[in-house]
């Protein structure tokens, strides 16, 4: 018979791995947001995209908010979901709009964000249930 120690240990390991992934994603998205705001080459890239510089700033703000949200218990699942949506847009832009686009990194970040969102889906459902108190 098992006393549940193995299951608790496995859950602890999964939780630690998720936190490490969230920290890594948060650090990358903060770096990416910094580049969006301050790297002159990003101005040219967003000119090539054709939607104007406002999209660069919106993307930077979303990435900053998502990076911070990844590190806040209770918001990490929602932040990961939001960042996954940003990476869907980034991947589509790299594939369909930019002439020499490379969607490899956005797709990797999309996958990692989806993994966090799936494993932290309890955060998402708790957040949604708070929005609809009548249920």
Please give the residue ranges for each predicted region.
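Membrane-interface extramembranous regions
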Residues: 2-135
